């Protein structure tokens, strides 16, 4: 991977801290707090409010970072949109190849995709909001803006490797804890983790990763029949 000579897109120290610390809050503490306060929440409602609260807090915390990178999007929209589209086609191809390998070993549907599809049937509006808008914003600020952005200041390879692994774990851990065979599905999320990091680094604009993530989620949900 060649170094990028564009001015680096970086958060402030407190923004790095907030974006990274929000990851365990989002995964573990906030859902339990919401269920304690609102025990009648549906699964779709729990996910919606977890992402909505995260989107609000992270946007407020990282507003300056988002605005600076939006200026970069505004200055060269065709380049950034083109890189997002390029990333999407690379993502489709790589996920297709990895899926062939995974399904050869474990010929059943990805449980995360199945869960999203079931929720979309029951609570379509909320799941559309989560999948297309809230999740890309929250996840890109946590993973690409926070984890990757901080670690690459010291070691790019570590930044790529750890961010890819955490992103894959984030989408699979709850299923893998019920059956260890589901750890294989980690492989399906590694290409996305890499390509989202690379798209962000190549353009030095977090909006490239956010837009790519939005596009991928939208098409994936449509393909799943959501």
Q: Residues of each region from the PLM?
A:
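Alpha-helical transmembrane segments of multipass membrane proteins
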Residues: 22, 26-31, 54-59, 90-99, ...
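Transmembrane helix-loop-helix hairpins at the membrane interface
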Residues: 96, 100, 104, 124-226
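Gram-positive cell-envelope targeting signals
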Residues: 1, 5-17, 26-27, 31-34, ...
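Interfacial transmembrane-helix boundary/kink motif in multi-pass membrane proteins
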Residues: 2-24, 43-51, 67-100, 152-158
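Internal transmembrane alpha-helix with an interfacial aromatic "cap," most often the third helix
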Residues: 63-71, 138-144
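Alpha-helical transmembrane segments in multi-pass membrane proteins
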Residues: 14-67, 112-114, 126
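Juxtamembrane helix-loop-helix connectors linking adjacent transmembrane helices
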Residues: 39-43, 67-135, 178
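Membrane interface segments of multi-pass transport proteins and intramembrane proteases
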Residues: 35-45, 106-111, 148-161
């Amino acid at each position: 991977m060649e170094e990028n000579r564009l001015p680096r897109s970086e958060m402030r120290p407190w923004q790095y801290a907030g974006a990274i610390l929000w990851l365990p809050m989002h995964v573990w503490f906030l859902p339990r707090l919401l269920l304690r306060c609102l025990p009648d929440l549906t699964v779709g409602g729990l996910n919606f409010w977890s992402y909505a609260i995260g989107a609000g807090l992270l946007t407020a915390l990282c507003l300056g970072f988002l605005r600076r990178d939006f200026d970069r999007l505004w200055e060269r929209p065709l380049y950034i949109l083109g890189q997002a589209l390029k990333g999407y086609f690379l993502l489709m191809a790589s996920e297709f190849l990895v899926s062939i390998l995974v399904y050869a070993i474990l010929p059943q549907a990805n449980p995360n995709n199945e869960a999203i599809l079931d929720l979309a049937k029951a609570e379509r509006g909320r799941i559309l909001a989560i999948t297309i808008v809230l999740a890309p914003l929250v996840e890109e600020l946590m993973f690409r803006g926070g984890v990757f952005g901080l670690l690459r200041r010291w070691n790019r390879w570590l930044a790529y490797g750890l961010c890819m692994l955490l992103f894959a774990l984030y989408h699979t851990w709850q299923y893998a804890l019920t059956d260890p065979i589901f750890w294989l599905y980690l492989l399906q999320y590694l290409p996305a983790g890499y390509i989202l990091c690379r798209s962000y680094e190549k353009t030095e604009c977090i909006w490239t990763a956010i837009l790519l993530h939005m596009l991928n989620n939208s098409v994936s949900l449509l393909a799943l029949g959501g």
